[in-house]
Amino acid sequence: MTDAFSSSSEAVLQRSVTSTHSFHPSGDLLLLYQTPETCRFITSNHFKKVALQFPDELLPDAVRVSAEIEDKTKAKTYILGDTSYGSCCVDEVAAEHVGADCIVHYGSSCLSPCRRLPLLYVFGKRPIDVHQCASSFKELYPNLQSHIIVLFDVTYSHAIDDLRTLLCDVYPNVVVSRLKTDHSCGAELIQDSCVDLQSNDDGVIFKFGRQFRIKEGQTVNDYSIFYIGQEGLTLTNFMMSWNNCVFSSFNPETSTGRVESVQINKALMKRYYAIERAKDASVVGILVGTLGVANYLIIIEQLKDTIQRAGKKSYMFAMGKINVPKLANFLEIDIYVLVACPENSLLDSSEFYRPVVTPFEMELACNKHREWTGEYVTDFRELLPGGSSHVGFPEPSQSATEEETTDVSLITGALRSCSTNSSEMMHNSETSSLVLRNQTLTVANTNAAASFLAGRSWQGLEPKLGQTPVVKAVKGQRGIAIAYEEEGNEDASTQQKL
């Protein structure tokens, strides 16, 4: 749904906003927002301008937190709201507009890396009953020898140290993840896990800002996963990425644990259907869904190259908040690919007129060397050269001109041709003055935009050059549509005649 990516504009306009003068007591405010640690971060780095980014639910405390930081550090603070793409992402663009030296991001986060400005995460400390969480864990996993990975929402990172103490003495094979960020208040105090993380080997797993180490000879699929937090995008992201694992969760809001019964196979079938739609597409729209995640420009260029190699046409769209009416304006686009942070990449496109896929799904559709194995990637940085899931195109030989393959669409049942052009043809794609002939002496030069135009029932106004008489320009009407200036005079003259 569109709400998974951005808030509904109608809901924002109709929302009732109440003023809260005493949102948190002063003592709780310093503890919740970890003001001493934030001030220490600012003063130790000699920052003079600081951008404070608050999600909507924490904005009532923004003024008090800002005043406290300015009083302790003498630095100038600027309060920022959510980005156009979601509250989990850091708004580096707005911070640069005010000339900030660093950013302090409050609340939940997708932990996507940023490169422009120094960044400090303050996740806050949501309440959680650690003993009840441990009790639910023991009920869900009665076998003390179970291999389990513990993941958590970042807002509960403050309690993971206590939970690890309660579990590791009883469950020797439990692996507790830790946050892996450049700067985060409190995260540095959390120990690695029950299993030592100091060794740098292949057993260390890094995913969505979490890091843990599994035992030698095992994979993540050999473990069950216990997640601490509410049902949401973070949990869905993990379940899609590790779709062969059995998930359980503990909701601190209700203090209840359960085995997750989300039909991941059904969700993967929907995504595979979107991949088939991408294979059938001729014109692809690249949606820019982030301006702050590191390497987003690199993945856009890689997508352009991949789409071009597959014989498709691509256009890039940077339109801020994405909604159905905006995307419906471009009928020529067959499918969209969204470049966003991992938590906002899985956009349910059922409401849109055209499907919206992820960069991983687009590469599956365009790169025949990447095969569907059940592995699912939502972090586009893993698709870049050097990433764990990078699959490049082979370098074309000098004698090769074009390699054509024929495929059958699983949706329409029609034949479709997939061509991988040589580098020379790619660099000369801007001109079609000279084209190569194949062995049957037929010239083939397809254009997706021209094909779409030829298939439309109405192709625009026909110029009919030389067939229409040339006339002088005449004075048009003045005013607004509800009442032009000449209309009033005509009505008055008509009444006089009557």
From Swiss-Prot:
GO BP annotation list: protein histidyl modification to diphthamide
Co-factor binding details: Binds 1 [4Fe-4S] cluster per subunit. The cluster facilitates the reduction of the catalytic iron-sulfur cluster in the dph1 subunit.
This protein's record includes keyword ATP-binding: no
Pathway: Protein modification; peptidyl-diphthamide biosynthesis
Sequence positions that bind [4Fe-4S] cluster: C89, C110, C341
A cellular component term, taken from the record's GO annotations: 2-(3-amino-3-carboxypropyl)histidine synthase complex
Keywords of the record: Iron, Iron-sulfur, Metal-binding
InterPro entries (alphabetical): DHP2, DPH1/DPH2, DPH1/DPH2_1, DPH1/DPH2_3
GO MF: 2-(3-amino-3-carboxypropyl)histidine synthase activity; 4 iron, 4 sulfur cluster binding; metal ion binding
Cofactor: [4Fe-4S] cluster
Function: Required for the first step of diphthamide biosynthesis, a post-translational modification of histidine which occurs in elongation factor 2. Dph1 and dph2 transfer a 3-amino-3-carboxypropyl (ACP) group from S-adenosyl-L-methionine (SAM) to a histidine residue, the reaction is assisted by a reduction system comprising dph3 and a NADH-dependent reductase. Facilitates the reduction of the catalytic iron-sulfur cluster found in the dph1 subunit.
Oligomeric and partner information: Component of the 2-(3-amino-3-carboxypropyl)histidine synthase complex composed of dph1, dph2, dph3 and a NADH-dependent reductase.
NCBIfam families: diphth2_R, DPH2
Similarity comment: family membership: Belongs to the DPH1/DPH2 family. DPH2 subfamily.
Protein name: 2-(3-amino-3-carboxypropyl)histidine synthase subunit 2
Organism in which the protein naturally occurs: Danio rerio (Zebrafish)
